[in-house]
Amino acid sequence: MRHKEQSEGPSVRVLRVGEQVRHVLSEILARGDVHDDVLATHPVSVTEVRMSPDLRHATVFVKPLLGKDEEAVLKAMRTNTAYLQREVAHRIRMKYAAKLKFLADDSFDEASHIDRLLRDPKVARDLEGGDEGDQG
């Protein structure tokens, strides 16, 4: 029997379940079903959910839409973890209820940092000079 190599990445099933969990959490937060003052005043985007291969653990990446009070939003999400886990378990039929872990999504910050670097005049000059050297 062949063993799955580590480099293959998540299976289609793991990706599908992660997307279902993301959709359910987004719906709960959009409706305001969580009775929390911080979450009521800060719209939150669930950007990605990464499931473990056994589907028992989910890492949920969240980002406040206005980009403010990220730590307060994360604390509120973590405070309401039990409620959110229960709701996900009720709405998605799985053998085990996934344990949710909330983390801040820094991908937007990293993308804007890279964009700023690429727009830097020194970098633009180097990129333009590199293109001319490749043509000869």
UniProtKB/Swiss-Prot annotation:
Its main location: cytoplasm. SUPFAM superfamilies: Ribosome-binding factor A, RbfA. It comes from the Bacteria. Pfam families: RBFA. One of its GO terms (cellular component) is cytosol. InterPro entries: KH_dom-like_a/b, RbfA, RbfA_dom_sf. Keywords: Cytoplasm, Ribosome biogenesis. It is found in: Cytoplasm. One of its GO terms (biological process) is maturation of SSU-rRNA. Gene3D superfamilies: 3.30.300.20. GO terms for molecular function: ribosomal small subunit binding. Monomer. Binds 30S ribosomal subunits, but not 50S ribosomal subunits or 70S ribosomes. HAMAP family: RbfA. One of several proteins that assist in the late maturation steps of the functional core of the 30S ribosomal subunit. Associates with free 30S ribosomal subunits (but not with 30S subunits that are part of 70S ribosomes or polysomes). Required for efficient processing of 16S rRNA. May interact with the 5'-terminal helix region of 16S rRNA. Belongs to the RbfA family. This is Ribosome-binding factor A. It comes from Sphingopyxis alaskensis (strain DSM 13593 / LMG 18877 / RB2256). The lineage of its organism: Bacteria, Pseudomonadati, Pseudomonadota, Alphaproteobacteria, Sphingomonadales.
